[in-house]
Design a protein with these regions (language model features):
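Short acidic-hydrophobic surface loop/beta-edge motif
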Residues: 1-3
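Short, proline-centered helix/strand-breaking motifs
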Residues: 6-15
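Short, surface-exposed, charged amphipathic helix/loop patches that serve as local interaction elements
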Residues: 15-191
Length: 191
């Protein structure tokens, strides 16, 4: 986000929600791949494709429309995770983060809808393989961990402090040099 580094943790939709929306999810998934969009642009445009197909079928708007049922459920199942200096990580439900302007709907909706299409249409093995390709292009990760387990798997937050050592000016590392790890600090995301 513009306010700092953060991640979205999303949970797949339930079988009941899939049964209610299988047709529109299948049409969206098929359209992404039959139009040659695939994993390159699919995560960016999946929500737009869902909206177009749903609108063409006159099922996008309204109380029982796809926007108010499926899309709201996808958002409900997602959380924004951000680092807090001295505390570790904190979360806020994605719908609240959207309401507060911490993240923009258009910045997250495509990837969330794409993930939902992929994870609900395919077998777990197919989903894993497809999302592995997506993660390389879109800097995302797929995991079966719950939100709490996933946060626990993140690196421990440590303030950047001087070690007293002189920084190396070499641009190359030797094979005996341990790789340096990135230090994660506060994302300064207001909640």
């Amino acid at each position: 986000t513009e306010k700092g580094k953060a991640w979205i943790h999303a949970t797949p939709i339930s079988k009941e929600v899939f049964k209610e929306h299988f047709f529109i999810l299948s049409k969206t998934f098929s359209a992404i791949f039959s139009e040659g969009l695939g994993v390159v642009s699919g995560p960016r445009i999946a929500c737009l494709m869902l909206e177009r197909i749903s609108s063409d079928m006159n099922i996008w708007d309204g109380e029982k429309g796809v926007r108010n049922t499926l899309v709201n459920e996808i958002i409900r199942l997602a959380n924004l995770v951000y680092p807090v200096e001295g505390k570790g990580y904190d979360t806020i439900p994605l719908d609240m983060a959207l309401e507060r302007g911490i993240v923009e709907f258009d910045d997250v909706a495509g990837e969330l809808v794409f993930f939902t299409c992929v994870s609900s249409i395919n077998t777990p093995e197919q989903t894993e393989q497809m999302m592995l390709v997506v993660s390389g292009m879109w800097n995302s990760r797929t995991s079966s961990l719950s939100l709490t387990e996933w946060i626990a798997s993140l690196p421990t937050l440590k303030p950047v402090a001087s070690s007293g050592a002189t920084a190396s000016t070499l641009s190359a590392t030797s094979s005996t040099t341990q790789p340096e790890t990135d230090s994660v600090t506060s994302g300064q995301i207001p909640v």
